UniProtKB/Swiss-Prot annotation:
A Pfam family assignment: ACP_syn_III_C
Membership in a protein family: Belongs to the thiolase-like superfamily. FabH family.
Keyword entries, A-Z: Acyltransferase, Cytoplasm, Fatty acid biosynthesis, Fatty acid metabolism, Lipid biosynthesis, Lipid metabolism, Multifunctional enzyme, Transferase
Organism of this sequence: Lactococcus lactis subsp. lactis (strain IL1403) (Streptococcus lactis)
Enzyme class: transferase
Protein name from the UniProt record: Beta-ketoacyl-[acyl-carrier-protein] synthase III
EC number(s) reported in the record: 2.3.1.180
Domain of life: Bacteria
Catalysed reaction equations from the record: malonyl-[ACP] + acetyl-CoA + H(+) = 3-oxobutanoyl-[ACP] + CO2 + CoA
Amino acid sequence: MTFAKITQVAHYVPENVVSNDDLSKIMDTNDEWIYSRTGIKNRHISTGENTSDLAAKVAKQLISDSNLSPETIDFIIVATVTPDSLMPSTAARVQAQVGAVNAFAYDLTAACSGFVFALSTAEKLISSGAYQRGLVIGAEVFSKVIDWSDRSTAVLFGDGAAGVLIEAGASQPLIIAEKMQTDGSRGNSLLSSYADIQTPFASVSYESSNLSMEGRAIFDFAVRDVPKNIQATLEKANLSAEEVDYYLLHQANSRILDKMAKKLGVTRQKFLQNMQEYGNTSAASIPILLSESVKNGIFSLDGQTKVVLTGFGGGLTWGTAIINL
């Protein structure tokens, strides 16, 4: 049996930092209003870099830090809902930028659950024995799809990218247990339409739009459905909530994390948090938190730490992977 392991982490965010006070100059809001409701203080906003640019910087760092040749990468998966273009994929652009000429590459679209879905997929590619090494990256430039006049959504999101190098050769499974879910019937509660349908043959025209969100519906979904998903995954792994060392959840709202910890009966300190500096970076939020945690020495990649990764967001999608790091 081939087991996969995460052997390297990296993250990158644009240099431009936009604070709550900065936002108060362009919309009717203030620092206290934003922070008290979200836990967000700052976010990094691109001044020109696109999604593939952010992802490529992460990919290059992963390869460089591992002293690898780009030609040894077998696959690249980029989780994103803000691609540079429909074709080519963001992953294909990354493959070209880093020179991973032997890698197949594709995007995975699952919004804020994207990194967890992508990691699950990559782990199966490795454990099948067909591939030895791949990059899994979450990358978003949400600033290009936000309505900057809508304070209910514009204050929430940031831009960034992060990822992992996943390789064969572990002595234990990377994923102890997992549970991925989707409910498309609730998809309109978090929506970003991409393109018009305007042809001579169309009976109805669908116009593109900026991001729209039913905030209360999404909050209720997060605090109701997601803890059940985590608990079900813990049961599959035969673990209690307290036996997990750290919980790395999608960084959407600090109040959501407060309620998650309470529902699971876990001390809040186990729920790591960095949304105060990055905002909601969608598919990039979990890997940014993972990369920062390793870089800051909170835990290492020695296989001795049990971590819950949980994403939740548009689709609606949500999923948990309990992993050995």
